[in-house]
Amino acid sequence: MQLFRHSYSTLVIIGGCILLLVSFGIRHSSGLYLIPISEHIQTGREVFGFAIAIQFLMIGIGSPIFGAIADKYSSSVAGLLGVIFFLIGLYLMSLVEGSFLLIISQVIFGFGCAGCGTAVILGAVGKAVTGKYQTLSLGVVMAAGSLGQFLIVPLTGFLIEMSDWQRSILYLCFISLIMILFSL
């Protein structure tokens, strides 16, 4: 039983690390799309800034909702729903032709970020790891989120430079598919 508990804890930590690494990295890459999207939809930076602000508001609104889903059903269900919203919002962002779709994509994307963000992931890790290793495991998972910003933001910049901004978002969608596996 102890071995199973240890293996389960390790899987939850690895899954949490991957989820936060990818979701934080992609979420914090959003600013790199300011110029390409603003030029594409022929607006100033204020529309894009407003959409990103809405994204962060949706993270704040969605976090307690996904926390309640995690409490009532499981962290896996909440994480999977979050990843689905995350992918839909990210994909819609690649289809943006005007400010309305940009804002809608960020509403959905932000809601998804809440589901595969710290509230759900750290709750799952905190339940899976007990005792003296709990704070260490929570720190490792949060460090993975920071590592995601360190790795994925430059990767996104490279993808934008090597292809167009819409294709780079589709590449990020493809990378994000790994989150489905680790949300289970």
Which role does the model predict for each range below?
Residues G89, F100-I108:
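Paired small-residue
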Residues I84-E97:
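C-terminal ends and interior cores of transmembrane alpha-helices
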Residues Q42, S74, L95-E97, T130:
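Helix-breaking motifs and short loop linkers at transmembrane-helix boundaries and internal kinks
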Residues V141-L184:
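Helix-loop-helix hairpin linking two adjacent transmembrane segments in secondary transporters
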Residues I37, G115-V129:
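Intracellular juxtamembrane helix-capping segments at the cytosolic ends
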Residues G62-S74:
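Helix-to-loop junctions at the C-terminal end of transmembrane segments
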Residues S76-G79:
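Primarily marks hydrophobic transmembrane alpha-helices of the MFS/SLC 12-helix fold
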Residues H28, F56-P64, Q149-F150:
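Residue-level signature of mid-helix packing/kink "hotspots" within the transmembrane helices
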